[in-house]
């Protein structure tokens, strides 16, 4: 193809993604678009086709972004090339959304006709506006009995400020309005800008590891073109590779002769080392490099940290390899090696949120067959010491001695909770219980309220989302962003078994709740840890001060069983002998801590706590 033909082809390309709150029908709409454009034969079609991970299909959520090429013949008789990039809707996967939006010129905003705008819808719309995307509102599920499209249309205009007069009324399930959506994409989404004859600049927005072909990069070509045989260079580290194959996904990978400006596809270049490629990096040609890299993504900082340890210690290296492969496919995961006296060798991992942590743990166990112990999640605290230093601590066992601590600051988040009016009281009560500070409250319409609180992140990573859903019967939607660090009265609580600290059970707690929390954990551990031959005291301590204690009684043999009658001194002698043996055992004995003990620190219910 000559340059002119490529430029004409570029004018026919439309890159768009679908953004929505969880469960507003995003993946179903993607299915209908695939059917309508006959990208997938009816034999291969299955519900939520783009959610290819078993975990995604089971939980009914999208975790990974997916990029697919479709051909659509519009009413004007021209054939257009669509690149559909499906994105997740959950707050923990916002990073995936921001990556896919950077590869697009337009976004379809799906809003549920019954539920209206939710917190996550807003968050994703603002991401799309930051990327200067053309936004096409679609009001979905209009066939539901509770649907009220006109109210939702007014909401889109009032709350988001988009012109919704031409919003498509659709039902992805029933296949209504799909053609109208496709026509709007042709008319309203701009063709990609960029020069075919400029030096190559391609943005890596995802990558996956293939055992045979090495790392496969998913890219959006911004300028120039790339074909098999080219020598490409990574702009962040200067590493070069020979391209073996380029192509597109239809969801299956299909090889092509070239990828040109505006295309979204994959590049395979026999890249064997996972660390050589980074999502957000720019690829260029080694013999004709671009002058500067593309504006990448802002690096996401993990919010929640937890220790991951293999149950079988010989699986440590397998766990490292598994984490490296997952990191390639999930750029927001971070990890570093750490050791624990109680659990041996493992990794300290950083996640974007609790669902992200859950999904990573499940993927490690499923895809790589590694059984794991996970320690209680914690956040990054700023510890100011008495000698003027500021330490960033994410692991409770690394906290300095209490005598060295001057003050501790913890991260607060701005939590936006959208909730029906009748549940406002329940939400406010929950937020206060989680040490939240009320900021403001707005009415979206007659029935729905947007409540904003400042809440410590440590309270949110625990079980806030579950509690919010149960106290509002599932009607509340929730989105949060980190706002600031604030000084708080925090203390580190250690758990001692038989006088020895168990580092993996340490946690940070607010001074106010320290006693209840300590008592609760001590009582829980008493039920879980098996009885030993000697008495085991379980203590919760802040520094040197013990705040709660519970004892596991010793198992004992009845040494008096064979004494019938006889002198009392004979019995006493046997009892003293037994006591001395127990004492010796206690001095040298160690207590095995079962896996459930670590999990019990995690599953601290508020109902137990209060």
From Swiss-Prot:
- State what protein this is by name: Elongation factor 4
Identify the coding gene.
Answer: lepA
Q: Where is the tr-type G domain?
A: 11-193
Q: Name one GO molecular function term.
A: ribosome binding
Query: What Enzyme Commission number(s) appear in the record?
Result: 3.6.5.n1
Q: Which Pfam families match?
A: EFG_C (PF00679), GTP_EFTU (PF00009), GTP_EFTU_D2 (PF03144), LepA_C (PF06421)
Give the record's keywords alphabetically.
Cell membrane, GTP-binding, Hydrolase, Membrane, Nucleotide-binding, Protein biosynthesis
The GO annotation for biological process reads: positive regulation of translation
Q: In which organism is this protein found?
A: Streptococcus agalactiae serotype V (strain ATCC BAA-611 / 2603 V/R)
